[in-house]
Amino acid sequence: MPPMAGLFWLLAAFVAYVYIGYPLALHLCRRLWPRPLAPRGRAAGTPGVSIIIAARNEGAQLARRIDNLLNLDYPADKRQIIIVSDGSTDNSLDVVAQYGPTVESVALPVGGKARALNAGVDRARHDLLVFADARQAFATDALRALVAPFSDPDVGAVSGELVLEGETRDRRMRISDRRRPGAPAVAPDVERRSTDRRLAAESTVVEGVGLYWRYEKQIRRDESAIGSTMGATGAVYAMRHSLWRRLPDETILDDVLAPMRCVLAGFRVVFEDRARAFDRAARDAKTESLRKRRTLAGNYQLLWLEPALLLPWRNPAWIQFVSHKVARLAVPYALPPLWLLSLVLSGRSLVYAAAFVAQCLFYLFAGYGAWLEKHDARAARDPWARPSAAVPDRLARVALMVLVMNASAVAGLAAILTRQKVWR
């Protein structure tokens, strides 16, 4: 086989493994060699939990978030709530003070999320640490579901599930219910058109993010079923206090570093989809790109904050870690030479020509997805502009999401190399 052809097939196999082969292999392993929790791991229980939230200038939503935590189905005497203010200049501390001794506060100068979490753990008095964000809300039974797997002594950390509220039907119902009291009634067809226009402005990226997130969650479920998932959901995860190690101040992904340290210590990190937190998907490609840049920059950072993760004799989940976290970082650098090689080789075989055409179609679909995003934003103003649910449009939105993710990986590396600040 000529060298160029060999390189083409090597790159094609690599990209296919990352996005298709690894998820399929995981699912097969789950079927053949599942590793269920010990039977007592599903037993009901209410161990003491310390809930820690690092917040900066979140005063506008802190009251709603604290109320959500106080209304969870969990005994008040087994629950400690700690809000760490990372240099807030708004009324965040005043909001927390209104709750008296029920909610504890820690005021720090600006130092970053990792330092704030370390300070919160220093105040924690219970055996289980629960980490959450100020923006998302927990389901009423989230805490009970999150702590249940810890009755299996092999479990060191548990990740909950982040539910993205981007479904058009559900959002239409919520928007329709948000009319101001006393406002005049609106004709159903007028209200429906108005609602559809607002939903249109959000549909392109929301749909792409939603599809990607469902794909990602299935990978996490399968990883968890055979051993450990690679990290946790930052909005809702828990770990044993005894396994906590202080985070370096510059840490970007506490929700990956802390759980993976549990894996290195010989414990499992499991995914519990009954422990749900709710959030909104990004409303445009720029916002989603910034989120992914932060996440992927954090994945690069992991490699030198905890280099033992790259050592197969130290990391019992080495194959999963390399396949899920490391290989994805390399995909953006495989795509350009793969396209160029298929172009050069396209005259030699229909296989290479088909590969070249397929890649061109992918990039064209991604470009069309970017156009759809602008079109959908215009639909919020133009009653004649309508978002399409046609299959080509859905494929375009997915292609745009994949392209955004890979571009964000490159931007994430640039952010790390230039020491840009990616957590605010």
Predicted stretch roles:
Residues M1-R42, Y363-A366:
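N-terminal membrane-anchoring/stem segments of glycan-assembly enzymes
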Residues V18, P109, R115-A116, T140-R171, ...:
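Long helical/loop segments within the catalytic core of UDP-sugar-dependent glycosyltransferases
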Residues A43, D279, R328-Q420:
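Membrane-embedded multi-pass helical conduit in multi-pass membrane proteins
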Residues S50, N68, P75, S85-L93, ...:
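A conserved acidic beta->alpha catalytic loop
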Residues A60-R64, K78, T89-Q98, D141:
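Acidic helix N-cap motif at the loop->helix transition within catalytic regions
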Residues A76-I82, L93-R123, E161, E207-R214, ...:
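Conserved donor nucleotide-binding strand/loop of the catalytic core
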Residues L129:
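Short aromatic/hydrophobic "clamp" motif used to bind/position activated sugar donors
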Residues F150, D154-E167, E202-E216, D249-D254, ...:
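Catalytic donor/gating beta->alpha subdomain of glycosyltransferases that bind UDP-sugars
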